[in-house]
UniProtKB/Swiss-Prot annotation:
<dbReference type="GO" id="GO:0032991">
    <property type="term" value="C:protein-containing complex"/>
</dbReference>
<feature type="active site">
    <location>
        <position position="473"/>
    </location>
</feature>
<feature type="active site">
    <location>
        <position position="350"/>
    </location>
</feature>
<comment type="similarity">
    <text>Belongs to the protein arginine deiminase family.</text>
</comment>
<feature type="modified residue" description="Citrulline">
    <location>
        <position position="212"/>
    </location>
</feature>
<feature type="binding site">
    <location>
        <position position="153"/>
    </location>
    <ligand>
        <name>Ca(2+) 1</name>
    </ligand>
</feature>
<feature type="binding site">
    <location>
        <position position="168"/>
    </location>
    <ligand>
        <name>Ca(2+) 3</name>
    </ligand>
</feature>
<feature type="modified residue" description="Citrulline">
    <location>
        <position position="218"/>
    </location>
</feature>
<keyword id="KW-0156">Chromatin regulator</keyword>
<dbReference type="InterPro" id="IPR013733">
    <property type="entry name" value="Prot_Arg_deaminase_cen_dom"/>
</dbReference>
<keyword id="KW-0479">Metal-binding</keyword>
<keyword id="KW-0378">Hydrolase</keyword>
<keyword id="KW-0805">Transcription regulation</keyword>
<feature type="binding site">
    <location>
        <position position="351"/>
    </location>
    <ligand>
        <name>Ca(2+) 5</name>
    </ligand>
</feature>
<protein>
    <recommendedName>
        <fullName>Protein-arginine deiminase type-4</fullName>
        <ecNumber>3.5.3.15</ecNumber>
    </recommendedName>
</protein>
<dbReference type="GO" id="GO:0005737">
    <property type="term" value="C:cytoplasm"/>
</dbReference>
<feature type="binding site">
    <location>
        <position position="349"/>
    </location>
    <ligand>
        <name>Ca(2+) 4</name>
    </ligand>
</feature>
Length: 666
């Protein structure tokens, strides 16, 4: 909230003061009253509004002037109607009265100035002049909320640059400028005003490394933008001419919200009195604009696809052809990372997660680069980040990482309402251990802190450490649905698979085999149903999935009708530490690629009944009534045998939400 310095009156000599248009400036009448005086009267020139907060006047004189008692509850404020054309051109006279003394007068000379710091606090995409008396220092959420928004300038307009745009202190061109939030300082003063007064723009020292402010000088060339605030520079003295003047600034974020940074950055303009060189500068007026750094937002499977990413490796040519056909149907771009750039690391989903950031004036896709740093480690930096495509990461020591820090373990739900609480951008889903032990694995706390700090997609922690790889995309997915809910949650289900196989066995199909057409030992339905060890292992897996089912129903507000069980069997295998973890027994169909109504599902190689794979037919029977098209893709030798499937080997850039994140209430 804008604040002016208290004006103290002095009966023995005139007082000179500055009042800013639109701000009520306190006038200390009682503290300066001579001893023995009990009431006062006040008059002002036409350009000054006087407001006395008190009970009714004690006495009204024949001239119409009022008198007020000098009580402790007394409050007097002054407001000027307009900026002064010359110094001291407005006057206020205070008259003190006592029962046994002659009246004493104090004279205050007022200089009115216009001074406002304006930003897009109404979130329209344009800077409007600051409204007098409107608080710009408080940032509020919701459809009626106010407060400016700031983007982290994390793209790279110059492809030849070594880093992101915010990593230097230059503005490259107008495109770079569009990633920043404009701010304007407007002043109107007497011509000689700044001979005795100084304006200073500042940011709290604790936040100067989170923001950079450029001042625009004449012209529009990049060299005409000078750094005013930023790392190592928390204040900036403005040298301004008197009269009416406008100064433009451009503000860029340097850091995303995180555990140690809530995302709020106040920028403050201070007016200082430097008229007496023998005294320190005195604070006359102060106003602030608070920016919030836009959060990084994930996009769920229900958002329309725009681009699919995949790796070319030595033996996945047929997989790539199938994927090309699918992306063509879905009308989205296919980007293939060549072998020499991925170094046999085909796990595109694990390497990165593509989301976006948004301000009223700009939306920017941003890739979140996982800390796993394997063969694909350079792909997000060299092939994804670029002009109008941002980048963020959290660097961690390799010794601190587990498989749960890869981004197959990072998903997001569609929008949900939970016990009356709306999550219009969905909720982030991450996998952790169900309980702590010396062998348990969790997503690194630094990653969890970053995701939680974004505020708009409150994370839900699931139990995934029971899996060999340990990722949530191994047992869940979401698909769009043409109904009020708008989606279905898909969960892998050993129970559903056993029920299907038992039904087929009862129909006389017990000798039908899995893995037909593969160089792999075939197993009949009868053999699978009679394998007690496999049944026991899948009973354990089912208990783990059921635990997550309950969490998802509670935290996403789902009913059983919102969930589809996808038949799937698992087997247990020892990991590097000798602990038993679950792997997919046949290609894991829930680990699918969702491109609108087109689904790329791992081909399960289930038993063939009447010329059709019974597992494929079962999945079609659940998904095609929703208007979805199922394409089963053979990923057996290129992905499945390495503990991954179609989703693990691909990544998708999706269309941002139409819902504006600042309209929600976290």
């Amino acid at each position: 909230m804008a604040q002016g310095a208290v004006i103290h009156v002095a009966p023995e000599q005139p007082t000179h003061a500055v009042c800013v248009v639109g701000t009520a400036t306190p006038l200390d009448v009682r503290g300066s009253a001579p001893k023995g005086y009990t009431t006062f009267g006040i008059t002002a020139s036409p350009g000054v509004i006087v407001d006395v907060i008190h009970g009714p006047p004690v006495k009204k004189s024949t001239m119409g002037a009022s008198k007020w008692p000098l009580d402790p509850e007394l409050e007097v404020t002054l407001q000027v109607k307009a900026a002064s054309s010359r110094t001291d051109d407005e006057k206020v006279r205070v008259s003190y009265y006592g029962p046994k003394t002659s009246p004493v007068q104090a004279l205050i000379y007022i200089t009115g100035v216009e001074l406002s710091l304006s930003a897009d606090v109404t979130r329209t995409g344009r800077v409007k002049p600051a409204q007098a008396g409107k608080d710009q220092s408080t940032w509020t959420w919701g459809p009626g909320g106010r407060g400016a928004i700031l983007l982290v300038n994390c793209d790279k307009e110059d492809p030849q640059a070594s880093g992101m745009d915010f990593e230097d202190d230059k503005i490259l061109d107008n495109k770079d400028l569009q990633d920043m939030s404009p701010m304007t300082l407007s002043t109107k003063t007497p011509k000689d005003f700044f001979e005795k007064y100084q304006l200073v723009l500042e940011v709290p020292k604790a936040k100067m490394n989170r923001v950079r402010v450029f001042r625009a000088t004449r012209g529009k060339l990049p060299s005409r933008y000078k750094v005013a605030l930023g790392p190592q520079q928390f204040s900036y003295c403005l040298e301004l001419p008197g009269g009416q003047h406008s100064t433009d600034f451009y503000v860029e974020g340097l850091a995303f919200p995180d555990a140690d940074f809530k995302g709020l950055i106040p920028l403050t303009i201070s007016l200082l009195d430097k008229s007496n060189p023998e005294l320190p500068e005195a604070l006359v007026f102060q106003d602030s604009v608070t920016f919030r750094v836009a959060p990084w937002i994930m996009t769920p499977n229900t958002q329309p696809p725009q681009e699919v990413y995949v790796c070319r490796v030595s033996d996945n040519e047929d997989f790539l052809k199938s994927l090309a056909t699918l992306t063509k149907k879905a009308k989205c771009k296919l980007t293939v990372c060549p072998e020499e750039e991925n170094i046999d690391d085909q796990w595109m989903q694990d390497e990165m997660e593509i989301g976006y950031i948004q301000a009223p004036h700009k939306t920017l896709p941003v890739v979140f680069d996982s800390p796993r740093d394997r063969g694909l480690k350079d792909f997000p930096v060299k092939r994804v980040m670029g002009p109008n495509f941002g980048y963020v990461t959290r660097k961690l020591y390799m010794s601190e990482l587990t498989g749960l820090d890869a981004f197959g373990n990072l998903e997001v739900s569609p929008p949900v309402t939970v016990r009356g609480k709306e999550y219009p951008l969905g909720r982030i889903l991450i996998g952790n251990s169900g309980y702590s032990s010396s062998e348990s694995r969790d997503m690194h706390q630094a990653l969890q802190d970053f995701l939680s700090a974004q505020q708009v997609q409150a994370p839900v922690r699931l139990f995934s450490d029971w899996l060999f790889v340990g990722h949530v995309d191994e047992f869940l997915s979401f698909v769009p649905a043409r109904d009020k809910q708008g989606f279905r949650l898909l969960l892998s289900s050993p129970r559903a698979c056993y029920q299907l196989f038992q039904e087929l066995q009862s129909q006389g199909h017990g000798e039908a085999t899995l893995f037909e057409g593969l160089k792999r030992k075939r197993q009949t339905i009868n053999e699978i149903l009679s394998n007690k060890k496999l049944r026991d292992q899948n009973a354990y897996v089912e208990s783990c999935i059921d635990w997550n089912r309950a969490v998802l129903k509670r935290e996403l507000g789902l009913a059983e009708g919102d969930i589809i069980d996808i038949p799937q069997l698992f087997k247990l295998a020892g990991n590097s530490r000798g602990n038993s973890k679950a792997q997919a027994f046949f290609p894991n169909m829930v680990n699918m690629l969702v491109l609108g109504k087109y689904l790329g599902i791992p081909k399960p190689f289930g038993p063939i009944i009447d010329g059709h794979c019974c597992l494929e037919e079962e999945v079609r029977s659940h998904l095609e009534p929703l208007g979805l098209h199922c394409t089963f893709i053979n990923d057996f030798y290129t992905y499945h045998v390495y503990n991954g499937e179609v989703h693990c080997g691909t990544n998708v850039r999706r269309k941002p939400f139409t819902f504006k994140w600042w309209h929600m209430v976290p």
